[in-house]
Amino acid sequence: MAHRTALYDAHLAAGGKMVDFGGWDMPINYGSQIEEHHAVRQNAGVFDVSHMTVVDIAGAGARDYLRQLLANDVDRIDPGRALYTGMLNDNGGVIDDLIVYKRDNDYRLVVNCATRETDLGWMEKHAGGFAVDIHERPELAMLAIQGPKARDILAGLLNGSRADAVKSLKVFAFAEDGDWMIARTGYTGEDGVEIMLPNADALTLWEQLLEAGVSPIGLGARDTLRLEAGLNLYGNDMDESITPWEANMGWTVMLNDREFIGRQPLLNQKENGHSEQVGLILEGKGVLRAHQKVLMPNGEEGEITSGTFSPTLGKSIALARLPAGATGKVDVEIRNKRQVAQVVKPPFVRNGNAVYKEQ
């Protein structure tokens, strides 16, 4: 039987169509995926992301442990700030991408549900020699409230320091109030926050948000929103065989004086060359989909890793992995026919506007 979040019955009550996602029963949509997508771009939407795995890392060795475990460096941020990073294997491949929240005396990680067992096993394996406690927090729910009006609406529903945090937090900063953690982060390319809170509090906040005009958003629109924002989906755009250099995650790699797992293979690959992730926009009709073949004018080939129809742009878009230096026009094989696509630098959309640049 699949896992269910504390909001499972609320999803059904809102008309949610439930599907299996990484072993969880989650809503794919509540009626119209397109309308949900536009609601987040134009107003505000709430996502139940309680299927994500929350892990607290404490102990005197937590800092040194995470500096070895992660490709990005937790020393780059102060308490109250968050950091996006990859957790790599010995070959530099991405075991998972995650967010680290740095507190005064410990850290919180949010990792993907589909990689939970692999992640926890890897983290435990490499904890030897460090004074650390790795503690999963299944009693916490997680809601993402996203969109241009999201923070204003949410602040009006909360009191005191929680409302202040929603109004004043800078991007990738967070604040804690009791058992709540409020972070100005997201996966949509819009402004908003993500809140970790006790399962017992989640339903009340969910109902308040819907009553205030915030739309419930399913996994379908979550995917089109993140793809417009040029954000990776683990298992599609990267996995253990793909390095950060090949997944447009090079900016998350800190090659400073510390040793971290996968560092040497990354140095070798950076010196020897590697494929690159780019954006594609289809010039004609049709839909770009994962695993479609991309053909470059010089005869080299690549592959689409994620593709969809962009409701905001009214065009089909994709992320693709191509040989280094790809620019201009390429051909994509769609149903055994070649169609022309333009190579662009993602993201495609931010804050409701087209922002991509042709390459």
Curated annotation (Swiss-Prot):
GO terms for biological process: glycine decarboxylation via glycine cleavage system. Signal peptide: none annotated. SUPFAM superfamilies: Aminomethyltransferase beta-barrel domain (SSF101790), Folate-binding domain (SSF103025). Its EC number is 2.1.2.10. One of its GO terms (cellular component) is cytosol. GO terms for molecular function: aminomethyltransferase activity; transaminase activity. It catalyses: N(6)-[(R)-S(8)-aminomethyldihydrolipoyl]-L-lysyl-[protein] + (6S)-5,6,7,8-tetrahydrofolate = N(6)-[(R)-dihydrolipoyl]-L-lysyl-[protein] + (6R)-5,10-methylene-5,6,7,8-tetrahydrofolate + NH4(+). Keywords: Aminotransferase, Transferase. It holds the Pfam family GCV_T. HAMAP family: GcvT. Belongs to the GcvT family. The glycine cleavage system is composed of four proteins: P, T, L and H. The glycine cleavage system catalyzes the degradation of glycine. This is Aminomethyltransferase.
